[in-house]
């Protein structure tokens, strides 16, 4: 060992008690500073108390954890939306104005359905008429429909998934996109960097070589703390073809979604396909995420065509960049609006106190409340937490069902006989406060009847 290194080592050894003490004092000062941050910024009192106690009691462990998971807002995204390209803001204003002027349901939607006005405020977009929505039950039906649409694409394809795997389905999906790219179709692909963590470099390189613009959704830091943030994930699932068809719902791209998982099979999930003006809202949601990641705005088709089915649809994006807890409020409003029926299906049923109280109040009103959760779990801790909420909601009027026919992953609400909620959001804290989600709200009796028929079948495979 060189002489100078020996001297430094000896100096550290001689003063190590003082250095350890000084380090601990600095850590405690940082912990106290973060306690103030937690109290000021946590969205719930429970979260503020939990972080504060843990930071003071175990600073060595909890300080790094808070820096990675404790921030309540996706500040980089928030700043980008507020200070971003003026062209994006102008485009969003134009699209929303067109929806209001040309495609809003006749009359005031809030006059006979007060929830409609509330949901529009949460979405910052209006319900649109002239839509046609079809259920896609499970993976085979969903991906057959998506692949058919991709094969017919003429101009562009927008793709966004939380999970994109390099397995049989993922490779087939890649091949379909590469074929259309070779035909001159523009393809824009987003995947979440954590959800798609195992995606191989070879897979990504093949996409880029084919001319497909593929980017990973990850925290784009605006400061040092932002570099440590991994807690905010983009959980949305979107495929838009030529601005004419949008596929939205609960399925990602992986073999398990086709029932090929060794343990979680068959896989029960729900997606839907939309045609009509609501497709423009799905495009706008995709474009905001794309612009935040790439600072680019691809030219898209914003000419909507109405469909004979004339369904009323709202596409409602939610996420940690919102000014309020939009996803939680959406669920609370849906539950509070129920007059005769409230059927909830969620793979992760870990609601917070406001949602639990809303469910109990619905039961007290005499609403037929049914909650379907998985019998087979992909995450044991989450399942046990869900069962704890089942026990807590053990009151007359709330019926819980456990799905027995494989793994249940769909996220569906059926309210009364005319309103459905289908999308990517779970009834848990991640969806309420941490994930970017997307839910399609359809107000149409015929479509609600289809959803009812689907859920009755699911209840028949439950106990």
Which role fits each region the language model picked out?
Residues 1-329, 333, 337, 377, ...:
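N-terminal localization/anchoring segments of enzymes in phospholipid and broader phosphate metabolism
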Residues 205, 358-362, 388:
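Short, solvent-exposed amphipathic alpha-helical segments in soluble enzyme
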Residues 345-346, 403, 422-423:
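Thr-Gly-centered strand-to-loop micro-motif
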Residues 348-370, 374-375, 379:
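Helical hairpin unit composed of two closely spaced alpha helices linked by a short loop
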């Amino acid at each position: 060992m060189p002489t100078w290194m020996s001297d430094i080592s000896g100096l550290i050894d001689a003063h190590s008690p003082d250095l350890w003490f000084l380090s601990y004092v600095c850590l405690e000062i940082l912990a106290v500073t973060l306690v103030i941050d937690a109290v000021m910024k946590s969205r719930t009192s429970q979260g503020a108390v939990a972080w504060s106690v843990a930071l003071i009691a175990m600073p060595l462990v909890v300080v790094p954890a808070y820096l990675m998971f404790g921030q309540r807002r996706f500040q980089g995204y928030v700043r980008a939306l507020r200070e971003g390209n003026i062209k994006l803001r102008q485009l969003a204003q134009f699209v929303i104005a067109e929806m209001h002027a040309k495609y809003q349901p006749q009359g005031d939607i809030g006059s006979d359905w007060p929830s409609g006005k509330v949901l529009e405020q949460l979405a910052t977009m209006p319900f649109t008429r002239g839509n046609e929505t079809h259920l896609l039950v499970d993976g085979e039906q969903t991906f057959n429909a998506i692949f058919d649409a991709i094969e017919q694409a003429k101009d562009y394809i927008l793709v966004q998934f939380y999970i994109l795997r390099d397995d049989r389905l993922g490779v087939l999906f890649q091949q379909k996109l590469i074929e259309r790219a070779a035909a001159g179709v523009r393809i824009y692909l987003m995947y979440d960097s954590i959800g798609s963590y195992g995606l191989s470099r070879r897979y990504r390189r093949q996409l880029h070589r084919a001319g497909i613009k593929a980017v990973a959704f990850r925290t784009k830091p605006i400061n040092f703390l932002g570099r440590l943030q991994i807690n905010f994930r983009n959980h949305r699932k979107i495929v838009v073809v030529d601005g004419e068809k949008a596929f939205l719902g609960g399925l990602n791209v992986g073999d398990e979604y086709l029932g090929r998982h060794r343990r979680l099979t068959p896989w029960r999930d729900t997606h839907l396909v939309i045609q009509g003006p609501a497709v423009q809202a799905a495009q706008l949601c995709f474009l905001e995420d794309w612009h935040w990641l790439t600072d680019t705005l691809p030219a898209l088709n914003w000419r909507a065509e109405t469909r004979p089915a004339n369904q009323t649809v709202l596409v409602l994006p939610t996420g940690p960049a919102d000014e309020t807890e939009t996803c939680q409020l959406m669920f609370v409003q849906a539950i509070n609006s129920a007059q005769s029926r409230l059927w909830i299906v969620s793979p992760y049923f870990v609601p917070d106190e406001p949602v639990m109280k809303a469910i109990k109040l619905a039961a007290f009103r005499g609403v037929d409340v049914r909650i379907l959760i998985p019998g087979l779990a992909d995450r044991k801790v989450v399942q046990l937490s869900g069962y704890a909420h089942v026990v807590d909601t053990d009151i007359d009027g709330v019926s819980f069902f456990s799905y027995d026919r494989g793994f249940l992953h769909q996220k569906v609400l059926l309210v009364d006989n005319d309103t459905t909620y289908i999308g990517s959001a779970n009834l848990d804290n991640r969806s309420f406060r941490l994930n970017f989600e997307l839910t399609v709200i359809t107000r149409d009796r015929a479509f609600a009847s289809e959803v009812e028929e689907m859920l009755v079948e699911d209840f028949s495979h439950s106990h």
